């Protein structure tokens, strides 16, 4: 998150804590909802559930508004709430073992790779999404927070309640598993592109 965005969030946080400013609360919601949605939906595999959890995150923020000035990093604070809600949801799901296949197909993670760095076929994108989706829970959460939500290692360590070294190790494991899983051969892809012209 940019310094300007961080300063703005801190300003909104103060307005909410001191004055119960509903306009600041709405702006905070608009600012943090998109990254929270990507994070939660990547874990719970359900867009409607993710939307509901975002509401729950902000209800908790509003309920704790008097104490918000004590929160050092509201962005991290919201992601910790989101993580806990997501894990609680998954635990309930595991107990009931009821899965909705449509939710899985709707929420394949949308891994972004800069097109200037790499031409990628639709099939390769699908393979990458499946590889990310098949990562173990903690690896996937760390990968999502760092690669899709642009959190720093230290912030992820705070969110996950683990050491920075563990974050580094888990990200390395995630990247290795993704790489192995997709069995990517750049030279072969480039040859196919040159021969077919696609």
Where are these regions (language model features)?
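N-terminal module of bacterial RNA polymerase sigma factors
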Residues: 1-35, 116, 198
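C-terminal edge and immediately downstream basic/flexible tail or linker adjoining helix-turn-helix-like DNA-binding
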Residues: 3-4, 158-159, 175-198
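Internal acidic/polar
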Residues: 6-10, 96-118
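Short, charged helix-capping/linker segments at alpha-helix termini
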Residues: 17-27, 37-56
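Sigma70-family region 2
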Residues: 17-18, 58-73, 92
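Structural recognition of an alpha-helix C-terminal capping motif at a helix-to-coil junction
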Residues: 38, 52-59, 72-84
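Arg/Lys-rich amphipathic alpha helix in sigma70-family domain 2
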Residues: 80-99
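Helix-turn-helix DNA-binding module
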Residues: 130-133, 137, 141, 149-166
